[in-house]
Regions:
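ATP-dependent helicase/translocase motor core
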Residues: 2-235
Length: 235
């Protein structure tokens, strides 16, 4: 099977799976007018926060977005840890209501009702920081780039999932701000698909061999089992 897949074909197969089977909205990066120095999909971010936090005023939402875009100084790992706290527990903000200061949390994701969230898959999403890079595939939830996928050609002997891992590490150096918002990194060459975090060494990236709790009894799970099992919206 791998012999019939070029890297471009494989990328298209992954995009098609996420779009048609899992229901992610598909966008082609160059078609989106945006600031290439921002890793966020800002056209989706504010409407998503409004939808999830219906009772909060715009001042609270704009402060949350400001905090998402302006992290205090620290290492990439420290910033990622702050973001993960925001993602899981909400962004603490203050706003004024009838002259009285109030404190609240702005939630980034609706974990109780997945249908309230907007899931987007993009390719050719340019981001400029230390240099200009375009990761193969990015998965956004409510405009936040939570997943970065690096694919390698399954038909080229000189490239494999390890090459994808090295590319991910290069991205962390060249476009570190993209990884502030990262929850999962994926490296895949069709035969082998593994997921990890920004702190994972290559040996800590793990396969995912189930879509429903029943594991594939094979050395390597098929790529569709991996992506469906890991990125189905209810996960």
């Amino acid at each position: 099977m791998a012999g019939y897949f070029t890297e471009s074909n494989y990328e298209n197969a992954v995009l098609q799976l996420l779009n048609e089977e899992l229901g992610y909205n598909y966008i082609y990066g160059p078609d989106v007018e945006r600031d290439y120095h921002s890793p966020l999909y800002e056209d989706v971010l504010l409407p998503s926060l409004q939808r999830i936090n219906k009772s909060l005023p715009m001042d609270a939402l704009t402060e949350a977005i400001y905090k998402l875009k302006n992290f205090e100084t620290g290492t990439l790992l420290q910033k990622n840890m702050v973001f993960m706290d925001y993602l899981q527990n909400g962004v603490p903000v203050k706003y004024f209501d009838k002259g009285e200061e109030r404190s609240t949390l702005v939630y980034l994701v609706d974990f109780k009702n997945p249908a309230s969230n907007e899931f987007t898959v993009a390719n050719q999403w340019t981001f400029i920081e230390n240099s200009e890079k375009r990761p193969d595939v990015i998965l956004f939830v409510n405009g936040l780039p939570l997943v970065i996928v690096e694919l390698k050609s399954p038909s080229r002997e000189e490239t494999d999932a390890s090459a994808a891992y090295r590319q991910l590490r290069n991205y962390m150096y060249e476009i570190p701000s993209m990884f502030i918002y990262n929850a999962v990194c994926v490296m895949s060459d069709l035969t082998t698909s593994k997921a990890g975090t920004i702190t994972s060494g290559e040996d800590r990236f793990m396969e995912w061999k189930t879509t429903d709790g029943s594991y594939e009894n094979t050395q390597h799970a098929s790529f569709d089992t991996f992506f469906v099992g890991l990125f189905e919206k209810n996960r």
